[in-house]
Every structure is written in structure tokens, then in C-alpha cells.
Design a protein with these regions (language model features):
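Conserved adenine-nucleotide phosphate-binding loops and their immediately adjacent elements
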Residues: 1-48, 129-146, 244, 301-304, ...
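Alpha-helical sensor/transducer elements of the RecA-like P-loop NTPase core
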Residues: 4, 154, 198-262, 266, ...
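Conserved Walker-type P-loop NTP-binding/catalytic site
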Residues: 5, 15-23, 101-173, 221, ...
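Short secondary-structure boundary elements
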Residues: 23, 66, 241-446, 450, ...
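Extended alpha-helical scaffolding segments used for macromolecular assembly and cargo binding
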Residues: 57, 71-75, 79, 351-352, ...
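P-loop NTPase Walker A phosphate-binding motif
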Residues: 66-97, 101-104
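Internal alpha-solenoid helical repeat scaffolds
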Residues: 80-82, 282, 347-348, 441, ...
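Helix-turn-helix DNA-binding segment
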Residues: 867, 906-909, 915-988
């Protein structure tokens, strides 16, 4: 390929025009809207919902030519009449390889039309991460993301922030036509947005073809199939509608019924085909009489391609050449480039354009565009495969010479055959890096795989494999990443580069449930690094040791390798932070005193940013685990808050997923159930959107380290709320009801699954799960801090095997006393009290209450108080029992633990007290936190403003509002004031 001319901006999109926003002028726009009353009513109702602040999502689903675009046009007209702002975009077959192409169509015109100051405001705050994609704002201040430059989650979060800002200015209609041709990152954004429209002055309106889902049908299916989506399916015209349109077109004195029926049966009532048939008949001078019925068949409009061929046959060959060029370049093609691709001079091009417009093949508008996507598809399909590939390579050459961005050129190179051109490799590599920076690793993977096929020169192959493996990892394709990173390692000579590749390989193997392969994969490199880079060798030893830690099936002889690596830290010697974090986890697993675990974790935290960037993610994950379970709550909360915010501002989905799921566990252990639920749901959504898992975590093992933990936290919060049926549904939908793995974070899922079975009365299943878990982790995980399987099993066994229950509870209590952390000890004391001798019960429960009194673990404190009150009541100490029960009920209610609060209320009634009824619906059912959020929302504050006022996260506010709406049985924020009135929140 010719080199790119100097003086051209590298990111200019000269000659590459995304379908113009708002340019949704449908073929037959002047046609009357017939038999669409119901569709228009549903769209009007959705617009009214947006104006009322309720929010709505509508999907127009139907075959090509059925009139979806015409309905979108009508919706935009109605919105404009209702003072609703409109932004629009259209997917295109040649635009599926543009990172966030549809999203950019939506927002770039808004920013282009804004004054400089207004543009800065639009791209501030939550929208700031979108600045790199959309331009303007403070993109230069965003910093670099962690781990390979992937900004996928940050970009998504920024686009949502931008959308929220626009909706805050005025009710907003977002229109996306041909969403089945939207690029994958934009589809992710639309799905992300659809789940958040509720309660916002916004309508998301998309048009899709169910039979043409593109290469990303799952994302599209989920966008349309969501519970919040109203799917509108316009049908074909009836015979009556066809009669009306034929009458309008021909205005005859009389209309022959057989002619009308012939038009109807030939087109199947498809509006687009019908209008094209009518146009073709009129060009021939046909009148709608019985004599003309046979001519309908002669026109032969049974397929679009046949109709196009008939029209092109009436034009000079130059018109066909130009039509084919536009089909290759895509809608919105520049006339000069289309002429170049067609081999036409300017005058011949003008003549060809005029002819194509006159035959209703091209639209008469800026840029060259077909009257309907069906037309482009038909012309493109007529090109023989080899000719098509050559045309795309020539299109790439023309665009590159014109200064187009690498991504625009790469979309054509993907459709061109490899030819051993080194310049092509450079363009594709440039495009991949651009896609990664914008948060579209999926596209980067496609570009890089194509670059490898060119084929690449030997000198560029290591770099391509390294970048491909990193992109695959960012896209959640961990198995593929592992294989490509292995290949990169084999053909790389530089030791520093090899160490970085090895770290990425380690992550890919662990995340694809193959942690046991890490040690053999990195063994040879460690020996090599020991001779050439001693610090690098230590990093690699820590990487292998960390993988051995998270795989609980690691043989005892290999676990000794971990002890060898962390030995200097245990001896008190100065060590790098990645060794301190590893040592903290090793001490935690071995049930060494929590104070020692925290000391090592705090040392790691102080130097956590001294490690190389590629080594930080596993090190910080170890740090967070040590802090959470050794109960260094304050530092854990601060660091995790920073990590979540960093991911939102300029991080990847993997970074957010890791931080959110660990913070959800922290929140659950603290008893802040709404926050725990919010983070767990956000983590599952991130796993689903970016890493290919199912709605609640099901799917390939892309998120095997984190989705099970998020499901575990979600199960636990629902159990505490008494929502057992919801918990079972979450578990079933996750696909993890029977899944097992030796990886560490699966132990949390097994524990939560057992708690659910016990709550359902399926005690034998709970016991089997817990005892099997205990047998598996024996020797690898001694501490009860992570998963207290012994106390859980003891409580389940108490009614069947009291001796075994007591043995397990005593064993856990002994371990917990050594560990010394309040929550861990309180949980063990609670189990020992309920399974031990009755005469020791009150004493053990008093100790549990005392241990937890000053701990931030509010839920466990409330649980201990309720059990103490119940035990005191049974001993006849009613006054003291009531005090404990009332405190326990208050604590449980403030946590949102409805089931425990209800239990406390029942015990109070049994003690002779008359506690206030715990309402399950209505204003009295709101917890204090829910009422505070509801009051601020009723005052008109946005979710972000509420979050700032209450110092909580936006997802937490969303979770509270979801509970408020359910309890009050409302659908709009505007209904809050009338339901809340002047009443005060009910506290038991």
C-alpha cells in the first residue's frame, strides 16, 4: 500500500463517514402511515413516560422493508412536537468494525454544536471517561488505564454519564436504526443504558431485524429481550392498505381488485417492496386495470436484487460500477473516492449519480447513500468473492492515501485477502491500538488476527502475538489469550518483554480455570531470568506462588514453594510489596493471627504502586483479600473505593469486576446489604457485558474468578432479606447451581449455596456441600475467616448429629480464637453456643455480643443479640431478653436484614412484648437508608446528587430506589412525593 501522505492528521476520518446522525430519512418517507395506529400509540406512550421521568425502552422488530425506519421518523417528529430532545444513529454493514461507531453518531453532533464552555461541562464528572472517545473535554488528564491500555469499562461509564447529563437538560429520545448492524461496543452501551433508563426522563428506541443479528446476535437478543423492553412488531400491510396506496399512486377512475391483489401477493404486503413495485409500474406507464395484472409478474419484483438489476440495465455501465463502489465503501461514501474505486472521472461520476438517483437506487443527499439497506445488500451480494476482496483492498488503499484513520482503513482490510504487505500490518496494528484506547478490545482482536494472517514479518510477529494476547485477555477471551501469549513468549528474546508477557499469561491461565498450568508454563523463564534479571525472577516466583495459592487443589509439596517465596517476609526482612501481599494471604490461609496478616498487608499497601504496572493487578487482589478477611475494614474500604473509581474513570472491565466483587464482599461482611447487593449486581453485569458470561454469571469461564463470588454475595444478601425464591432464581439463572472448581473464590459460592439450601429446608444437601468443601480445602485453607464451613455445617447438623456438630463448632472456635478478628470470632462463638451444652449458651452468646460490640460487623452483632435475647427468654430472663432483642431488631432492620428482624420480632412477642409490626410494603416498610434516598429523590435530586449527599455509590442509590419502588408499588420518581407525604421513616 502507498504510504500515508504527510501533513494528514492521524486520527482524521477523511473519506470515512459514519452514517449521519438523524439521517434516517426512509424510503417512501412521503408515504402515508397506514395500519400503524397501535405502534404509534405505544411509541407515544413511551415518549410520555420519558417526559414524566419514568423512562422507557422500545424495540421495533421486523423484517427488512417492513417500515421500521418510517416509524422512527414519526417518533422523532412527535418527540420534537413534545419538546423532547432527539439524538439518533444508524448501524451500517460497513461500520460494524468502528469502535463505538453508533455511540459516536449519537453524541459527536451534540458536542460539535455546543460552545466550548458547554462542551467542557458535558464532558466533566461522570462523562469525563468518554472524552477520549468523543474528543474535547479533558481527555489528556484521564491518565493511562491499568493493564494493556483497555478502557472498556471507563468508556461505557462515561457514555452513560454523558447520556444522563443530556437527559437532565431535557427529556431525551435516543433513536438507533438498524441496531443489528451496530458495532459490539455500541451494543454493549445500549444494553447498559437500557437497564438504567427506568426512573430517568429518557426513551431508548431501537429498530432491529430479528433475522439478521450480525456477528453479535447474543448482545442484540438480550437488548431486545430485556424485561424493561416493549417490543413492537409492525406487520405487513393488509389488502386494504395496499388498495389505499395503489389508489394514492395511480389516482385511477376505477381500480381493478385483481391488480391490487397482484401487488399484494407479489410483495407480501412489505411496504418497501410495494412502493418499489408501484414505482416500477408507473415508470412503465402501467395502469391499474385487469389487463395490467400480468405486467406485475413481468416486472418480476419478487426480490430486491432482480428489481435493482432491471433498473441498472436501463443505465450506462458507469452507473453499475459506481453503485458497486458505494456498496463496497458503505453509505455516506465520498464521491471522489467512490469515483476512484469505480474508475470514473468526475464528469462520468456525476452522470452516474444522477442516473442512480433517478432510478431510486441512491438518495439525493450529501454523501452517496442507498435508498434502503436492502439495496446496498443486494448490490454487494452480486459481487463475486474474489472481486469483492480486491475492491476492499483498493478501497483501503484509497482511504489510506486520503488520510483516513487506521480503523476506517482496517474495516476494509478485514474483508480483503492477505497479500504479505507489511504496510497492512502496520495499519492494522495502529487500528488495534486505537480500538483498545477507546475501550473496544473485541475489535482490536479482529484487527490483530487479520494482521497475523497477512502474514507478518518475523520481526513483527512477537509484538503482534503479545498485543493479540493482551487484547484477547481484555475482551474476556482467556483461553485464546493463553495460547497466543505462550506463542509470544516462545518467539520473544528480550527478557523484560518476556517477564511482562509471562504475567499476562499467568492471568489468562488463572482466569480460564487453569491455574495449575502456571508453574510449568513459567518454570523455564524463571530459570532464565535468574541469570539475566534477578528482580524479574522474583516477580515471576511471586506470580507462580499466587497462582498456587488460588488453586486449592495444589498438592502439598507445591504449596511449600509458596512458603519458600514468602519466607523472608515472615522473617521480618524488607521485601518488595508483591512479596508482602503474597505473604499476607499465606498468613491468612494458615490462620496466623489477624494482626500479623494486617501488618503484612499494610506493608504491601504502602508500596503497592512501586511494582511494575503489569504486576499490580494480582498483587492488589491479594492485598484486598488479606485486608477484607483479616478485618482491616477501614483501609480495605478506602483502597477499594479508589480502585472502583479508578476503573470507572479510565479502567477495564476486568479491573472494575475485581474491585466491585471484593467490595461487595466487604460490604456484606460489614452488614451494609444494599451496598453489597449493588456492587454484586454491578460486578455481574460487567462480567456479562465484557467477559461473555450469562445474565447472572453463566457462560464460559471468562469470569471464573469473580462471577461466582458475586453470585455468592447476592445469594447471601437475598437470604438475609428473606427473599429465598429470588435467591434460587439468581442461582439457577447464573448456571452455577451445580458448578464446582478448585479455585479459591468458588468456595464462597459453595458456602452461599449451602446457606440457601439450609434456608429452603434442604438440610442434607447443605451438609453434603459443606463437608465436601471442608475435605477439599483441608491443608490449603485452615482459617475460618473466608468461609466458615465448620460452623455452617455444625448448625445444619445440630438436629441430626449433635456430637459431630459440637466437634465442628469447637474446632472452628479454637481456630477463631487464634485468628483473633472480631467478626470471625463472633461467628464461631454464635455457632458454638447453639450447638454446645445449653448451660453454656448464654455465656458464649454474651461473649459474642461483647466481641462484636465495637466491630463494624453490624449484621453479625445484631444476630448475636437476637440469639442472646432468645436464649435469655428461654431462661425466663424476660427483661434482659427484651433489651437484647430490641437492639438486635433495630440493628437487623438498619442493615436491611428483614429475615433476622422478623425473627427478633417473633421472639419479642414470645417474651410478652408488643413490638411494632414490620411492614413489608408501603412507607412503613422502608428502612432508614431507603427513606433517606426516597426523600432526596422526591425533592428532585438525581441519583448522582443523592450519592454525593449520602456519601454512597450511585449503584447503591439505584438499589435503594429499586426496593423503594417495589415497596411503594410505583414506577416513577414523580410518584414519590405523594406516597411519602410528611410521614417519617418507620424504624422498629
Amino acid at each position: 500500500m502507498n504510504p500515508k501522505p504527510s501533513g494528514r492528521a492521524g486520527d482524521a476520518e477523511a473519506g470515512v463517514r459514519l452514517a449521519a446522525p438523524g439521517d434516517l430519512d426512509p424510503a417512501g418517507a412521503g408515504m402515508r402511515l397506514l395500519e400503524r395506529e397501535e405502534e404509534l400509540q405505544r411509541i407515544a406512550a413511551a415518549i410520555a413516560s420519558a417526559r414524566a421521568g419514568t423512562g422507557a425502552v422500545v424495540a421495533l422488530e421486523g423484517s427488512a422493508g417492513i417500515g421500521k425506519t418510517r416509524l422512527l421518523w414519526a417518533a422523532m417528529e412527535r418527540a420534537a412536537e413534545s419538546d423532547v430532545a432527539v439524538i439518533s444513529a444508524r448501524g451500517g454493514q460497513m461500520e460494524t468494525e468502528f469502535a463505538f461507531g453508533v455511540a459516536r453518531q449519537l453524541f459527536e453532533p451534540v458536542l460539535a454544536a455546543a460552545e466550548t464552555g458547554e462542551r467542557e461541562v458535558l464532558l466533566e464528572g461522570a462523562a469525563a471517561p468518554a472524552a477520549l472517545l468523543l474528543g474535547g473535554g479533558r481527555a489528556d488528564r484521564l491518565g493511562e488505564p491499568v493493564g494493556g491500555g483497555d478502557r472498556s469499562f471507563a468508556t461505557l461509564h462515561g457514555l452513560y454519564g454523558m447520556t444522563s447529563k443530556l437527559a437532565a437538560r431535557a427529556p431525551l429520545l435516543i433513536v438507533v436504526d438498524d441496531a443489528h448492524w451496530a458495532d459490539v461496543p455500541s451494543l454493549r452501551f445500549l444494553g447498559y443504558l437500557a437497564r438504567r433508563v427506568h426512573g430517568l426522563p429518557m426513551l431508548l428506541l431501537v429498530a432491529v431485524r430479528p433475522e439478521d443479528p450480525g456477528a453479535h446476535g447474543l448482545l442484540l437478543t438480550e437488548l431486545v429481550a430485556g424485561p424493561e423492553v416493549d417490543v413492537v412488531r409492525p406487520g405487513p400491510f393488509t389488502l386494504d392498505a395496499v388498495r389505499t396506496l395503489v389508489q394514492d399512486a395511480f389516482a385511477p377512475a376505477s381500480l381493478d381488485p385483481r391488480f391490487v391483489r397482484g401487488c399484494w401477493t407479489t410483495t407480501g404486503g412489505n411496504p418497501f417492496l410495494l412502493m418499489q413495485l408501484i414505482g416500477a409500474l408507473r415508470v412503465r406507464g402501467v395502469q391499474p386495470t385487469s389487463d395490467a395484472v400480468e405486467q406485475i409478474g413481468e416486472v418480476g419484483l419478487t426480490t430486491v436484487s432482480r428489481w435493482i438489476n432491471l433498473r441498472l440495465a436501463a443505465l450506462p455501465p458507469s452507473a453499475t460500477a459506481l453503485a458497486e463502489a458505494v456498496a463496497v465503501l458503505g453509505d455516506g461514501a465520498d464521491a471522489v473516492q467512490a469515483a476512484g474505486l469505480a474508475g470514473l472521472d468526475a464528469d462520468s461520476c456525476d452522470v452516474a449519480v444522477d442516473g442512480l438517483v433517478s432510478m431510486s437506487i441512491l438518495r439525493g443527499a450529501d454523501g452517496l447513500a442507498f435508498v434502503h439497506p436492502l439495496v446496498r445488500s443486494a448490490i454487494y451480494a452480486e459481487l463475486a468473492p474474489r472481486r469483492r476482496a480486491r475492491a476492499h483492498r483498493e478501497a483501503a488503499r484509497l482511504l489510506w492515501h486520503a488520510g483516513a484513520a487506521a480503523e476506517g482503513v482496517a474495516s476494509h482490510l478485514l474483508a480483503a485477502a492477505p497479500a504479505g504487505d507489511g504496510e497492512v500490518v502496520e495499519i492494522l496494528l495502529d487500528a488495534a491500538r486505537s480500538a483498545t484506547r477507546k475501550g473496544a478490545p473485541d475489535l482490536a482482536v479482529r484487527y490483530l488476527r487479520r494482521a497475523l494472517a497477512e502474514p507478518a514479518h518475523d520481526t513483527s510477529r512477537p509484538e503482534l502475538l503479545r498485543e493479540l494476547g493482551t487484547a484477547e485477555q481484555n475482551a474476556g477471551q482467556f483461553a485464546a489469550a493463553a495460547e497466543d501469549l505462550r506463542r509470544a513468549l516462545e518467539c520473544t528474546d528480550d527478557i523484560a518483554a518476556k517477564i511482562e508477557i509471562a504475567f499476562r499469561l499467568r492471568t489468562a491461565l488463572v482466569w480460564s480455570d487453569r491455574a495449575h498450568e502456571v508453574a510449568p508454563a513459567l518454570g523455564g523463564l524463571i530459570a532464565e531470568a535468574a541469570k539475566r534479571d534477578s528482580e524479574g525472577a522474583l516477580l515471576l516466583e511471586a506470580a507462580v506462588a499466587g497462582a498456587l495459592q488460588v488453586d486449592l487443589s495444589t498438592p502439598r509439596r507445591l504449596r511449600g514453594r509458596v512458603r519458600q517465596v514468602v519466607g523472608p517476609a515472615f522473617a521480618g526482612e524488607p521485601v518488595p510489596p508483591h512479596i508482602s501481599s503474597l505473604a499476607a494471604v499465606e498468613a491468612l490461609f494458615a490462620n496466623e493471627p489477624a494482626a500479623r496478616v494486617l501488618r503484612l498487608a499494610e506493608e504491601a499497601a504502602r508500596g503497592s504502586y512501586q511494582a511494575p504496572e503489569f504486576a499490580r493487578a494480582p498483587m492488589r487482589a491479594q492485598l484486598f483479600v488479606a485486608l477484607i478477611f483479616a478485618e482491616g475494614h477501614s483501609l480495605a474500604r478506602r483502597l477499594l473505593d479508589d480502585e472502583v473509581e479508578d476503573a470507572r474513570q479510565h479502567g477495564s472491565a476486568a479491573q472494575f469486576l475485581n474491585a466491585a466483587v471484593l467490595r461487595s464482599m466487604l460490604f456484606y461482611r460489614l452488614g451494609t446489604l444494599a451496598e453489597a447487593e449493588a456492587d454484586a449486581r454491578a460486578a455481574l453485569e460487567a462480567a456479562h457485558l465484557h467477559l461473555g458470561t450469562g445474565p447472572s454469571g453463566a457462560g464460559p469461564p471468562a469470569a471464573s474468578l469473580h462471577a461466582p463470588m458475586a453470585v455468592a454475595v447476592l445469594l447471601d444478601t437475598l437470604i438475609e432479606r428473606g427473599n429465598i425464591e429470588d435467591a434460587e432464581r439468581v442461582l439457577t439463572e447464573s448456571g452455577l447451581a451445580h458448578t464446582d472448581s478448585p479455585l479459591l473464590l468458588f468456595t464462597f459460592l459453595i458456602g452461599a449455596r449451602a446457606r440457601l439450601r439450609a434456608a429452603q429446608g434442604r438440610t442434607p444437601e447443605a451438609i453434603d456441600e459443606l463437608l465436601a468443601l471442608g475435605a477439599r480445602i483441608e491443608g490449603a485453607l485452615l482459617t475460618p475467616a473466608l468461609v466458615p464451613w465448620r460452623s455452617q455445617a455444625a448448625l445444619a447438623l445440630a438436629g441430626e448429629d449433635a456430637d459431630e456438630a459440637r466437634r465442628l463448632a469447637c474446632e472452628e472456635l479454637e481456630l477463631a480464637r487464634v485468628f483473633g478478628a472480631p467478626r470471625t470470632l463472633g461467628v464461631a462463638l454464635h455457632a458454638a453456643a447453639l450447638t454446645g451444652p445449653v448451660n453454656e449458651r448464654v455465656g458464649l452468646l454474651r461473649e459474642a455480643v461483647a466481641v462484636l460490640e465495637d466491630s463494624p460487623a453490624r449484621l453479625e452483632h445484631a444476630r448475636a443479640l437476637v440469639e442472646l435475647g432468645a436464649a435469655l427468654r428461654r431462661q425466663g430472663q424476660r427483661s434482659e431478653a427484651r433489651t437484647a432483642l430490641e437492639r438486635g431488631m433495630d440493628g437487623a432492620w438498619s442493615c436491611g436484614a428483614t429475615a433476622l428482624a422478623q425473627r427478633a420480632r417473633e421472639e419479642l412477642r414470645a417474651s410478652g412484648s408488643r413490638p411494632r409490626r414490620l411492614a413489608l410494603s408501603g412507607v412503613d416498610a422502608l428502612t432508614g437508608a431507603e427513606r433517606r434516598v426516597a426523600d432526596l429523590a422526591a425533592q428532585g435530586l438525581t441519583n448522582r446528587q443523592i450519592a454525593q449527599a449520602l456519601v454512597v455509590s450511585v449503584p447503591t442509590v439505584e438499589t435503594h430506589l429499586r426496593h423503594v419502588f417495589r415497596k411503594l408499588d410505583i414506577t416513577s420518581r414523580k410518584q414519590l412525593a405523594e406516597h411519602l407525604g410528611s410521614e417519617q421513616p418507620a424504624e422498629p
